[in-house]
């Protein structure tokens, strides 16, 4: 459920995390899920099939996108898109002026115009079965356009636990990689994107 606090804006759940007030009802769980799936799919995977034009950096026209969603969901209002984006704790989407895009997770071919990460190390969580292959060959994107790395050990472990019960965390020597010309783009406070990570920059963090 998405609600709106007059002081702190849109939030998910029953009360504002900052002031604990209930706020104004905006969107129920069912509609939030439907919109979320469509927004994610369109901005990351199938913009053309959904009927929206995407530029080289992943931006689409917000008003045109809303029109497409209104045709699909007759209850759709532009406020719902703002509510979905602004209440998303993972920061998956970005609105700038009258444009909207996904920050990460793309399978479509887009270019990254984010700033370079200044973290000396970034992290990648893997299953025990993957580790030897990664240390030998490096990390390459599989279903997504870019390799997704985490800015902290904890975040890497959190992501890896979705896929394996016993994650192994690899540390990436980001400083040395960038010195050697590998671009590491900061998509959010927690996610760094790269074309690939060669094996010479990878180290297993021993528990």
Swiss-Prot record:
GO terms under biological process: tRNA splicing, via endonucleolytic cleavage and ligation
Stretches of the chain forming a coiled coil according to its record: none
EC number(s) per entry = 2.7.1.-
Instruction: Note the InterPro entries from the entry.
Output: Ptrans_KptA/Tpt1, RNA_2'-PTrans_C, RNA_2'-PTrans_KptA, RNA_2'-PTrans_N
**A GO molecular function for this record?**
NAD+ poly-ADP-ribosyltransferase activity
Q: Name one Pfam family in it.
A: PTS_2-RNA
Q: Which UniProt keywords apply?
A: NAD, Transferase
Q: Which family does it belong to?
A: Belongs to the KptA/TPT1 family.
Question: Tell me, what does this protein do in biology?
Answer: Removes the 2'-phosphate from RNA via an intermediate in which the phosphate is ADP-ribosylated by NAD followed by a presumed transesterification to release the RNA and generate ADP-ribose 1''-2''-cyclic phosphate (APPR>P). May function as an ADP-ribosylase.
NCBIfam families reported in the protein's UniProt record: PRK00819.1-5 (NF002015)
Q: What is this protein called?
A: Probable RNA 2'-phosphotransferase
